[in-house]
Amino acid sequence: MVNYRIVVLLFLLLASSCNVGPKPIAYGTDGCHFCRMTIVDRQHAAEIVTDKGKVFKFDSSECMMNHLKDIDQKQVALYLVNDYNQPGELIDATEATYLISDRIPSPMGEFLTAFKTEQAAVDALMTYDGDLLTWDQLKLRFNL
């Protein structure tokens, strides 16, 4: 009976430790997995979560995209980016619309900014000029 309880307890512990979900970014403390800079910009940070629950944090979308060149993307469960209009809010990167505008600087100088909705990106385009991209177009731009 004691062995059964231990097995159940271990199973529950293991099952709960493999939670696949985003983790909050500790701005000013967490470092970018790709470039090692401290993550401070709440409008441009990004994160990926593997299918095993491992989280990689980035100071910019461009660092995340460059990191994707070095890993098996089939193991990524979640791609997340910060919404420019809601600093600190992680959104689904595959559903976001991206603006490349030299009038909105990003941490790594690629001027890449994510928006939760296409309309928000179009509104920003009218103000800042530049080019709009979908997730698939962004992957092509980064040769992914």
Placement of each model-derived feature along the sequence:
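C-terminal motif of bacterial Sec signal peptides marking the signal peptidase cleavage site
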Residues: 14-17
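Short aromatic-glycine-(Arg/Gly/Cys) micro-motifs in beta-strand/loop hairpins
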Residues: 42-51, 91-107
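Bacterial signal peptide processing site
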Residues: 19-21
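Post-signal-peptide N-terminal segment of Sec-exported extracytoplasmic proteins
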Residues: 33-73
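C-terminal partner/receptor-binding element of secreted or periplasmic proteins
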Residues: 116-144
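Short metal-coordination and nucleic-acid-contact micro-motifs, chiefly zinc-binding Cys/His arrays
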Residues: 28
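Sec-dependent signal peptide recognition
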Residues: 3-9
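Mature extracytoplasmic domains of secretory-pathway proteins
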Residues: 57-91, 98
